[in-house]
């Protein structure tokens, strides 16, 4: 009301001023056109300016909401790093060996006697305690009906020779790399949760399946990495160096120098064990969790060769020539499985 009354009084005064100017112009002998022009210029220069509308209540609510938003945003970043992480997987394989005996023949393997529940506390006979892991022969002649008169294809001669899968420790690994022989090395050196998280921050291009919010990952990786996400303008990675950086034990193993890492991916436990198989290249490492290794010969070789199945666990390194085997990993157990897939070839 006050504003409206003020505007009315202003326009009344302007009207009086216009009348006074008009009278003065006539007295001075000015023409009507000149008087109108002078009045128009006067009104344009002295037009009353209306100030911006004031809404104090709305402005106060806006400030309160903005303050609350900043407080919640800050609290999210402060609380998120202390949220509980998934439990770190533990090396364990004793409870699954019994159910796998009918798939593979591990009777002569010392590690079987170590983990079999019925043999706990029973010492190994003779001098077998001092022997390295023997060759693991999962083939069974009773299950393989091979026609001797049928010629063996050239690309099937390797698996048809029934070379056993060699299970060994790092210190017992052959000095020379054998490309034709499947190999499993029991290092007993799994990846810790902190190592996996640091690796995913430093090399996001070679990690997959680690589902995590954008803000959560950024906060966890800061300040070690300002932008922990893959971007196209980054220079190519030295994947051979990354493999040995993540698994230093490779510097002591006889694999080629150009052996490299393709990708590390996380697999959650399947509702039904063995329901999903994950194919990898010729070289792989189990970072954490438990799995079943399956080596399957090419389709044209299955009349002459048989598949291989063996349980593997955290820290195990496996190799099988890609020209003679298809390598599959099947998750088992209740812990998430971290697989690092690599190759001994110069190109993936």
Swiss-Prot record:
Membrane-spanning intervals of the chain: 59-79
Localization, UniProt: Golgi apparatus membrane; Cytoplasm
PTM: Glycosylated.
Any single GO BP term: collagen metabolic process
Residue ranges that the UniProt entry lists as topological domain Cytoplasmic: 1-58
Subunit structure: Homodimer. Interacts with BRS3. Interacts (via N-terminus) with SIN3B.
Protein name, as recorded: Bombesin receptor-activated protein C6orf89 homolog
Domain of life where this protein originates: Eukaryota
Gene Ontology cellular component list: cytoplasm; Golgi membrane; midbody; plasma membrane
Bilayer topology: Single-pass type II membrane protein
Keyword Cytoplasm carried by entry: yes
InterPro entries registered for this protein in UniProt: BRAP
Residue ranges, Extracellular side: 80-348
Originating organism: Rattus norvegicus (Rat)
Its biological purpose: Exhibits histone deacetylase (HDAC) enhancer properties. May play a role in cell cycle progression and wound repair of bronchial epithelial cells.
Record carries keyword Nucleotide-binding: no
Keywords, in A-Z order: Cytoplasm, Glycoprotein, Golgi apparatus, Membrane, Signal-anchor, Transmembrane, Transmembrane helix
